[in-house]
C-alpha cells in the first residue's frame, strides 16, 4: 500500500464513500508502520467502540454521513455511564479525533467533523495516576520473596520491575543471552554484528564494562518488540543482589525450553509459546502485590479464604494490587529519592526527561526536602 493511497487529492472537495470499519482497518495498518504494537492495540481499543456505535446505534455505513450530532450522542452516551475517568475519556476522544483526521485526509469525512470532537481538558495533576507502588511496599514484597520464594520466577519479575523500572514488554523480550553475569558472558557481545561499533572500539568498551547487567534488545521479527523500537535498546546495570538472584533462577528454577522461534526466554513458560506473555507478567504483578500473598494482614478486612481476588482470573479485584506500570512509577520515585538525576533515569528506563518529571516521579515532599537539605549543606562545605 502506497503512503498516499488513501490521501485526499489536492484541492478535492468531493467525499469518497468509505465504511467506518474499513477506515479503522486502514488507519490501524498505517499506525503499525511507526508505532509500537502496544500503542496500536490501545488505539484499536479506543476507536473500535466508536465504530461499533456508529454501525449499531446510528446505522452509519458510510463515513460521508457522519456529522457533529452523531459525535454529540456518542459523547453523551460515554459520559452518562458515570464510571469513566476524565483521563480515560480524554485519551479515547483524542484518539477518535486522530482517526477522523485520517478520514478527512482520505476524503471520507467532512472537513469540520474532527474538530467537533469535544475532548475534555485534563490538568497535569489529573493526568498523573497516584497509585504508584510505594518504596516500603516494594521492599517488603522483595524481602518476602527473598526469604520464601528465592530465585523463583515471581522473585525475578518483581526484582527486575523494581530495580530496572522496565516495562513489562521489555522484561518479556529478554533472552538468556541478554543476561550478563560473568566475564565469559561478554564474549557474546563480540559476535553480535548489530552493535554499531568497530572491533577495537568494542574491546575498549568491554574493558570498562562492569558486571552484572542485562541488555534490552528490539526483535520485532520474532515477536518481542520494544515500545521505543531501536531507540529502546540499551544495557542496564543491575545490583550484585539481583545478579545473584538471576544466576540462581537460571541455574535451578527456570523452566527449560525455547519459544516458537527457537529462542531461550529468560522468563520462560511451560505453556505455549514457551515465553511469558505481557498479560502473564501483569497477573504475577497483581498476585505479589496482594498483601495476603506476601505475609501481610489484609487491609480491606477480607477473609483470604473467601476473598474473590484469590480466585483464578480475579487477581485484579484486590484494591491493593498494582500493575507493572505502578512498579515503574514507584521505581522512578525511588530512584529520584536516592538522588538519581532525571536524565539518567530517562536513559535507563527508555523514556523522556519530561515524563520522568511530570508523570512518573511522585515524591513524598518531606522526603524530597531532606535530599535538598543535603545539597544545601554542600553549598557551605569548605
Describe the role of every protein-language-model region.
Residues 34, 349-374:
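Catalytic-site neighborhood detector that most strongly recognizes the C-terminal catalytic loop/helix
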Residues 58, 282-347, 354, 362:
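Short, basic (Lys/Arg/His-rich) helix/loop patches that form interaction surfaces
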Residues 161-210:
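Short, charged phosphate-coordinating catalytic segments
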Residues 9, 25-128, 254:
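N-terminal core-binding DNA-recognition domain of tyrosine recombinases/integrases
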Residues 2, 139-168, 172, 261:
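Basic, Lys/Arg- and aromatic-enriched nucleic-acid-binding interface segment
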Residues 194-272:
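Basic, alpha-helical nucleic-acid-contacting "clamp/cap" segments
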Residues 2-10, 375-382:
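C-terminal secondary-structure termini that scaffold catalytic or DNA-interacting sites
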Residues 239-319:
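Active-site/catalytic core of tyrosine-dependent DNA strand-transfer enzymes
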Amino acid at each position: 500500500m502506497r503512503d498516499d493511497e488513501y490521501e485526499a487529492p489536492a484541492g478535492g472537495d468531493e467525499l469518497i464513500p468509505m465504511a467506518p470499519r474499513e477506515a479503522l482497518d486502514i488507519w490501524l495498518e498505517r499506525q503499525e508502520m511507526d508505532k509500537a504494537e502496544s500503542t496500536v492495540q490501545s488505539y484499536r481499543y479506543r476507536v473500535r467502540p466508536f465504530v461499533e456505535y456508529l454501525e449499531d446505534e446510528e446505522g452509519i455505513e458510510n463515513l460521508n454521513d457522519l456529522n457533529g450530532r452523531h459525535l454529540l450522542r456518542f459523547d453523551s452516551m460515554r459520559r452518562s455511564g458515570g464510571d469513566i475517568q476524565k483521563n480515560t475519556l480524554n485519551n479515547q476522544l483524542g484518539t477518535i479525533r486522530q482517526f477522523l483526521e485520517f478520514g478527512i485526509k482520505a476524503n471520507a469525512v467532512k472537513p469540520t467533523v474532527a474538530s467537533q470532537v469535544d475532548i475534555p481538558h485534563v490538568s497535569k495533576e489529573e493526568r498523573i495516576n497516584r497509585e504508584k507502588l510505594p518504596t516500603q511496599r516494594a521492599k517488603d514484597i522483595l524481602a518476602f520473596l527473598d526469604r520464601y520464594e528465592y530465585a523463583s520466577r515471581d522473585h525475578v519479575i518483581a526484582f527486575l520491575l523494581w530495580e530496572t523500572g522496565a516495562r513489562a514488554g521489555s522484561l518479556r523480550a529478554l533472552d538468556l543471552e541478554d543476561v550478563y553475569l560473568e566475564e565469559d558472558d561478554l564474549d557474546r557481545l563480540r559476535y553480535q554484528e548489530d552493535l554499531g561499533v568497530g572491533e577495537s572500539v568494542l574491546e575498549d568498551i568491554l574493558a570498562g564494562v562492569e558486571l552484572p547487567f542485562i541488555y534490552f534488545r528490539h526483535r520485532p521479527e520474532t515477536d518481542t518488540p520494544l515500545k521505543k523500537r531501536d531507540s529502546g535498546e540499551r544495557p542496564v546495570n543491575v545490583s550484585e543482589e539481583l545478579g545473584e538472584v538471576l544466576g540462581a533462577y537460571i541455574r535451578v528454577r527456570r523452566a527449560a525450553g525455547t519459544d516458537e522461534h527457537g529462542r531461550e526466554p529468560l522468563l520462560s513458560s511451560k505453556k505455549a509459546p514457551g515465553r511469558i506473555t505481557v498479560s502473564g507478567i501483569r497477573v504475577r504483578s497483581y498476585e505479589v502485590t496482594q498483601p495476603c500473598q506476601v505475609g501481610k494482614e489484609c487491609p480491606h478486612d477480607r477473609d483470604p479464604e473467601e476473598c474473590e481476588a484469590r480466585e483464578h482470573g480475579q487477581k485484579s479485584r484486590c484494591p491493593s494490587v498494582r500493575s507493572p506500570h505502578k512498579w515503574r512509577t514507584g521505581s522512578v520515585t525511588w530512584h529520584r529519592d536516592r538522588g538519581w538525576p532525571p536524565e539518567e533515569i530517562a536513559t535507563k528506563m527508555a523514556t523522556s526527561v519530561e515524563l520522568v518529571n511530570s508523570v512518573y516521579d511522585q515524591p513524598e515532599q518531606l522526603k524530597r526536602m531532606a535530599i535538598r537539605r543535603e545539597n544545601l549543606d554542600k553549598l557551605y562545605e569548605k
